[in-house]
Regions:
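Conserved RecA-like P-loop NTPase ATPase core
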Residues: 1, 66, 98, 131
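RNA substrate-binding interface of SAM-dependent RNA methyltransferases
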Residues: 1-65, 140
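Gly/Ser/Thr-rich beta-alpha loop segments that engage phosphate groups in nucleotides
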Residues: 7, 74, 100, 104, ...
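Conserved strand-to-helix beginnings and helix N-cap segments that scaffold or border functional pockets
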Residues: 13-16, 77-78, 108, 128
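Glycine-rich, phosphate-binding/catalytic loops in enzymes
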Residues: 18-19, 82-85, 112-113
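Short, solvent-exposed coil/turn elements at secondary-structure transition points
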Residues: 35-37, 71, 120
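Portal/gating segments that form or line small-molecule/metal binding sites
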Residues: 39-94, 101-108
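Structured adenosyl-cofactor binding patch, chiefly the S-adenosyl-L-methionine
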Residues: 105-153
Length: 153
């Protein structure tokens, strides 16, 4: 998982670490924070291009690039679990979360998939926490765990 931005508030960081630890029991997880571009206020386009270049340095040939974007495809937990099961057989999947400026359109165009956690715009810290929790929930579901209880109605 690659995310562009500064560290989130301590409470979000603590919860993210909790879910990252749980998730690592089900699948290999590496998180990389990409620093936001310097001088971002003056030229947002340049900053986004620099941040995209920094993200690309962490990508390998054959990676499945999944960019988080509110216009992306939404999934239920069960759909995410099925999708993850398929992805695990096909190789490394890299999720990318943009900065407060978003992500450069070139990176979105290169993505194998745009994925939405919500139609709302989320801070990168909250998006990271939600993604970690949902990935843990989906992988625990695949492992037959009890964390996901699904709809009771």
């Amino acid at each position: 998982m690659l995310w562009v931005g500064r560290r989130a508030p301590a409470a979000l960081e603590e919860l993210a670490a909790k879910y990252a630890k749980r998730l690592s029991r089900h699948l290999p997880l590496a998180e990389v924070r990409v620093r936001p571009a310097a001088g971002r206020q003056g030229d947002a386009r340049r900053a986004l291009a620099e941040e995209a270049a920094a993200v690309r340095k962490h990508l390998r040939p054959g990676d499945t690039l999944v960019v988080l974007d509110e216009r992306g495809r939404e999934r239920t937990t069960e759909q995410l679990a099925g999708w993850l099961a398929e992805r695990r057989r096909l190789g490394r999947t890299v999720f990318v979360i943009g900065s407060d400026l978003g992500l450069d359109s070139s990176l979105k165009n290169e993505a194998d998939e745009l994925f939405a956690l919500s139609r709302m715009t989320l801070s990168h810290g909250l998006a990271r926490l939600l993604l970690l929790e949902q990935l843990y929930r989906a992988t625990d579901l695949l492992a037959g765990g009890q964390y996901h209880r699904g709809s009771l109605g």
